[in-house]
């Protein structure tokens, strides 16, 4: 009986992808990015091995929030001091720090362990169109083809 071949970290060839977030909803962008970071788009996907690729997200400031998420979706953080709970609506976070909004959204879709942290570190988000990874020769990905 043949067994399923499992991927090894040394056998994986990683690619670099650029995704343009202009006029794309936050959830659709995040699910596509999380899937690529996990390696679920590859035939040799193995859940306990980091098989994913690198992702560069550009124009994060131009993504859109659908419905009433700009006012109703709240992101919380705590300073570890009494009364230190801070709440920021998604619309305000998009205006002030769109990179953080995309990072929080994608991070919530990855595993909460060391493997998820390794996968998260392969994502690079930029608010504008310029990025500093031209030397890696990233391929452009159309988000509409992934969904």
UniProtKB/Swiss-Prot annotation:
Listed InterPro entries: Ribosomal_uL13, Ribosomal_uL13_bac-type, Ribosomal_uL13_CS, Ribosomal_uL13_sf
Assigned keywords, A-Z: Ribonucleoprotein, Ribosomal protein
Keyword Transit peptide belongs to the record: no
Family annotation (SUPFAM superfamilies): Ribosomal protein L13 (SSF52161)
Molecular function terms, GO-annotated: mRNA binding; structural constituent of ribosome
Coiled-coil regions listed: none
CDD domains hit by this protein: Ribosomal_L13
Gene3D superfamilies reported in the protein's UniProt record: Ribosomal protein L13
Known function: This protein is one of the early assembly proteins of the 50S ribosomal subunit, although it is not seen to bind rRNA by itself. It is important during the early stages of 50S assembly.
HAMAP family: Ribosomal_uL13
Assembly notes: Part of the 50S ribosomal subunit.
Protein name: Large ribosomal subunit protein uL13
Organism, scientific name: Lactobacillus johnsonii (strain CNCM I-12250 / La1 / NCC 533)
